[in-house]
UniProtKB/Swiss-Prot annotation:
Residues 331-340 have a biased composition (Basic and acidic residues). It is found in: Membrane; Nucleus; Cytoplasm. This is Pleckstrin homology domain-containing family O member 1. The record marks 310-311, 345-346 as: Cleavage. Heterodimer or homodimer. Interacts with CK2 and actin capping subunits (capping protein CP-alpha and CP-beta). CKIP1 and CK2 together inhibit the activity of actin capping protein at the barbed ends of actin filaments. Interacts with ATM, IFP35, JUN, JUND, NMI and PI3K. Interacts with AKT1, AKT2 and AKT3 (each isozyme of PKB), PtdIns(3,5)P2, PtdIns(4,5)P2 and PtdIns(3,4,5)P2. Plays a role in the regulation of the actin cytoskeleton through its interactions with actin capping protein (CP). May function to target CK2 to the plasma membrane thereby serving as an adapter to facilitate the phosphorylation of CP by protein kinase 2 (CK2). Appears to target ATM to the plasma membrane. Also implicated in PI3K-regulated muscle differentiation, the regulation of AP-1 activity (plasma membrane bound AP-1 regulator that translocates to the nucleus) and the promotion of apoptosis induced by tumor necrosis factor TNF. The lineage of its organism: Eukaryota, Metazoa, Chordata, Craniata, Vertebrata. Residues 308-409 are annotated as: Negative regulator of AP-1 activity. C-terminal fragments could be released during apoptosis via caspase-3-dependent cleavage. The record marks 155, 157 as: Interacts with capping protein. Residues 21-132 form the PH domain.
Amino acid sequence: MMKKNNSTKRGPQDGNHQCAPPEKVGWVRKFCGKGIFREIWKNRYVVLKGDQLYISEKEVKDEKNIQEVFDLSDYEKCEELRKSKSRSKKNHSKFTLAHSKQPGNTAPNLIFLAVSPEEKESWINALNSAITRAKNRVLDEVTVEEDSYLAHPTRDRAKIQHSRRPPTRGHLMAVASTSTSDGMLTLDLIQEEDPSPEEPTSCAESFRVDLDKSVAQLAGSRRRADSDRIQPSSDRASGLPRLWEKPDKGATYTPQAPKKLTATEKSRCASLEEILSQRDAVPAHTLQRRAEDPPTPIPHAPGQLSRIQDLVARKLEKTQELLAEVQGLGDGKRKAKEPPRSPPDSESEQLLLETERLLGEASSNWSQAKRVLQEVRELRDLYRQMDLQTPDSHLRQTTQHSQYRKSLM
């Protein structure tokens, strides 16, 4: 026997709601539980009217006599209920009415079976529309009384009297002199509100006077701090002149003449054209006097150069011997290997080729060093011959060089 769901019944509705026609009525099968062998489905007459859902065992005209009444505001949505791998036509017509997951909601989930898939879609659309209207009706019924309005944020606030007088200049100067211990002084140039008519000083003059006072106070505080912090460790340090002890008044700055560069410094930054013009301007008797003077002996190191050449020659000879030995060893291995033109695959052959390459590079480097040393020796001998030339030939060559340079210019 079917029990009445008295817990879900609501109070009497208003007159307009009772007189309104139902949105949808019809017979559907409702899920009533599981039996021993199969599920239990029973035919029920369902009436959707407003935000109420009426379910009865037989068709009735008066909703007051219906056994089960459900408020759609307690439900979240209505959707299709279908098993993924089921081929039965019955599973294509199932739909469920899911309750909302709010605390205190005791409304049950309802499962129905429509006559056809088209009827199922019609019931789903109608129930979802009714659920939306029920939720909106709950929001529309929220009323706000006139007495509970929020107060205006700026219109009703208390007004504050702004009649406080700004601080005077003397107070600001006193605060600045006592609060600035690191030498920084803040100047706040706020003019007093009630200046006396007997002192018609302008803003610029008052600013200049305040600035002079501030600079004087700053200089005095710095002198006191420096005298307390600096203690000379010796008589020499105490005898040195101090910049902070010099009088401020009467001190004038005298620009000094730029330092004259010596001939060596000028030659460092002179251009090639200036150097050539200076050499051309040298008189002939100066060159003759320089030529008559005995040549200054230039310290040569022939023994050191010879030792370097011998060392390079020995290293070159040793490197060539090692290279010849490695090449012979590599040729012997290549002849014994079959086929002769196969690429080297063992680590020993790769190491042999790498050694041969390195020895070849070393041999070429030693040969280059030997050539460089030979050029150095030749340049040294040529320089000696130039120093031992006669003064007349030296003067003649200098004149020829100067004429050649002039012709190029």
